[in-house]
Amino acid sequence: MSVLVQFRVKVPDVERFRAAAAKFEPVIAGLGGSNHRAFVSESDPNEVATLSEWDSHDAMMAATDRFGDDFNREAGTEGLEWETRIWHEL
């Protein structure tokens, strides 16, 4: 059964994050992620989140091991504290 993965982080540059999220969308899709979208918080203009579906938590971990460092460099999120939540359909 697939999982919905939520990543959340406060960023110094939302536009830079948005550009990286768009650039890496095909990479994520190529590694098995689907419905990848990025969002900004209504209550905090520097808080962003991404949501994407994966076949499993392990599949997401294997994929992010391959592109995560490059994404963080592009997005300006190196060294920032990310919150990760894995959601299972009821």
Positions of PLM-derived features:
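Conserved RNP beta-strands of RNA recognition motif
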Residues: 7, 50-52
